[in-house]
């Protein structure tokens, strides 16, 4: 199992939240586990993106100390090991962890500490955020990505996350121009809540992977470009269903992309919020779209090819795929 698109603050399960609260002496606002889970995740009948986004509030209150961030990374990776995960890229926005005195660099170092001794091969992606007047904070994130950039075993790339429909991708040319100049590889959330133009802009910036990218289907020339240039799409089926990124899942474009030769991957996005695992994502695709074993293998090999890691590690991962 390979997961290239998983958010740290979207992977806080009930068990992890309780442990993080305990070690930080934080009192959680719930009467029982069911009530806590309702604060951390959405039901099958998620009504809107707004309902989905509310689930980030509580996890972020638990991720404002070095200890909290480090322990969260460790606990998440322990859970992923139990799920059979072989490689994962956890992403987070350092600027969202500075509400109680931490600097962005403190947050990055705390997350790096959490990787030590993990049973799962994990790398980190730092997220810039969409929003108003965030250029300074985002540029700091870019500089930190460069400072701690490694080929494997730490920070391996940069991302842009947040409200895509409200804050257009084109507004972040400065940040990703700097990232490109510094040689920091990046993926960008695009074509999730905004149209195909957002994907094109991200590719014009120099993104080698696209987070979600479901709305790329709106433009055939763009799809041809994506296929010809080996651009990777980090697709997250259940997240797209629950956030209403795709209103009609009967026309979910993953199979179309796969048949076109586009390098599609399957990921969890926010596994705790979506109440999902990578296994459940593949089960969903088998049940609803007739995904075959051969196609599943292709999706996993695509993920290995696209991973921000060394060729040596990729070869080790390929040898695990049967």
Name every feature range the model reports, one short phrase each:
Residues 186-188:
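Conserved hydrophobic beta-strand within the GNAT/NAT acetyltransferase core sheet
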């Amino acid at each position: 199992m390979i997961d290239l698109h998983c958010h740290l603050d979207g992977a806080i399960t009930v068990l992890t939240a309780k442990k993080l609260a305990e070690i930080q002496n934080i009192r959680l606002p719930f009467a029982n586990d069911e009530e806590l889970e309702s604060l951390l995740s959405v039901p099958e009948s998620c009504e809107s993106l707004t309902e989905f986004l509310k689930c980030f509030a509580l996890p972020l209150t638990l991720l404002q100390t070095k200890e909290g961030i480090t322990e969260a990374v460790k606990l998440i990776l322990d859970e992923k090991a139990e799920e059979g995960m072989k490689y994962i890229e956890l992403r987070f926005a350092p600027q969202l962890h500075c509400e109680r005195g931490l600097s962005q660099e403190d947050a990055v170092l705390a997350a790096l500490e959490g990787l030590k001794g993990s049973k799962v091969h994990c790398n980190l992606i730092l997220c810039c955020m969409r929003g108003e007047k965030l250029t300074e904070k985002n540029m700091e994130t870019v500089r930190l990505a460069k400072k701690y950039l490694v080929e494997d075993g730490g920070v391996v790339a940069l991302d842009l996350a947040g409200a895509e429909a409200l804050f257009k991708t084109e507004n972040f040319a400065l940040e990703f121009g700097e990232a490109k100049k510094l040689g920091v590889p990046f993926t960008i959330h695009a074509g999730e809540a905004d149209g195909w133009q957002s994907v094109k802009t991200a590719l014009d910036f120099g993104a080698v992977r696209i987070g979600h990218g479901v709305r790329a289907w709106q433009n055939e020339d763009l799809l041809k470009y994506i296929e010809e240039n080996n651009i990777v799409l980090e697709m997250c089926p259940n997240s797209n269903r629950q956030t209403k990124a795709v209103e009609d899942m009967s026309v979910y474009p993953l199979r179309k992309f796969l048949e076109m030769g586009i390098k599609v991957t399957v990921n969890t996005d926010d596994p705790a919020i979506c109440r999902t695992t990578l296994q459940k994502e593949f089960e969903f695709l088998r049940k609803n779209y007739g995904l075959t074993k051969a196609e599943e293998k292709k999706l996993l090999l695509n993920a290995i090819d696209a991973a921000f890691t060394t060729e040596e590690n990729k070869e080790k991962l390929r040898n695990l795929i049967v």
